[in-house]
Amino acid sequence: MVQPISWPQKVLVCSGGVDVSQLLHRIMPKLLYDNPKARQEVEYHWRASGCPHIVHVLDVYENIHHGKRCLLIVMECMEGGELFSRIQERGDQAFTEREASEIMRDIGTAIQYLHSMNIAHRDVKPENLLYTSKDKDTVLKLTDFGFAKETTVNALQTPCYTPYYVAPEVLGPEKYDKSCDMWSLGVITYILLCGFPPFYSNTGQAISPGMKRRIRMGQYGFPNPEWADVSEEAKQLIRHLLKTDPTERMTVSQFMNHPWINRSMSVPPTPLHTARVLQEDKDHWDEVKEEMTSALATMRVDYDQVKIKDLKTSNNRLLNKRRKKQKQAGASSAAPGCNNQ
């Protein structure tokens, strides 16, 4: 039978009688070893479950797994997959700037809900953005509260982050708070509009000293042809989100009131390069995701003082790889046919 136990949230003891095989078809479980950090994750996620763009926690069970006390978080099943995967699978169907705007409005709704509760998510990235189903009218939701923290008078100082989406103040001694989530929104917006991140590691590592320096300097650009047709309004929004000084970065309220977000139907339905870029670099993106997962547990703040490269001499490994492939493809198509002798 299932019995309630004493806890601030709805935690249940699972002692038998539950048909797990049937349950797994309808829910998405997550197992955590029972400790204060795990209970904090459950608490924040449970409190945020009222938002339509945050994955709902249905129940939490306490049990013994391999001799250790555990918490089983039962969440709604997100059958639509990850944000990037859905865009990759579009094939020849164009992904438009208007769609990118609508996606960012939904993500912003989740962040606004959290920030109104004084909760910083601190790990907003595409892998944590899931669709409820594969249907056309599916809903995008934010998940994974493993690094979430309540913001108080003391700003957040714990250096836990994912490299491609980490705010510059996390890489140095400065304190950081909700503005970290806003920085992540800027990076996700950037990727949605072109298919590659604004910051990168030239060494192939998940994060390198050079990548850290570029993040701290706000060193990025809008290269053609991927950005040639993207609206200036979208670029302006990204500039406000990627401000290196967190005090100058826009808040979530300002983000939601920005015309590119709150008037998404007026955003031009311009076809973007995003789906093609993500599809062409699909294998590389899988590698990047693996690097980011391992980096979460291993990265530490590094105060490398090596001279910063100028933007003109900085090499974007991801972009250069794509340019090389494009040149090779162009050379092949331009080569004359062979005549039989």
Each language-model region and where it sits:
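Short beta-strand micro-motifs within the conserved protein kinase catalytic domain, predominantly
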Residues: H56-R69
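Conserved short submotifs of the Hanks-type protein kinase catalytic core
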Residues: K68-E82
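Activation segment signature within eukaryotic-like protein kinase domains
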Residues: I103-M104
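Catalytic-loop of the protein kinase fold
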Residues: H115-T132
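Conserved catalytic-loop aspartate of Hanks-type protein kinases
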Residues: D181
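Regulatory extensions flanking the kinase catalytic core
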Residues: E248-V288
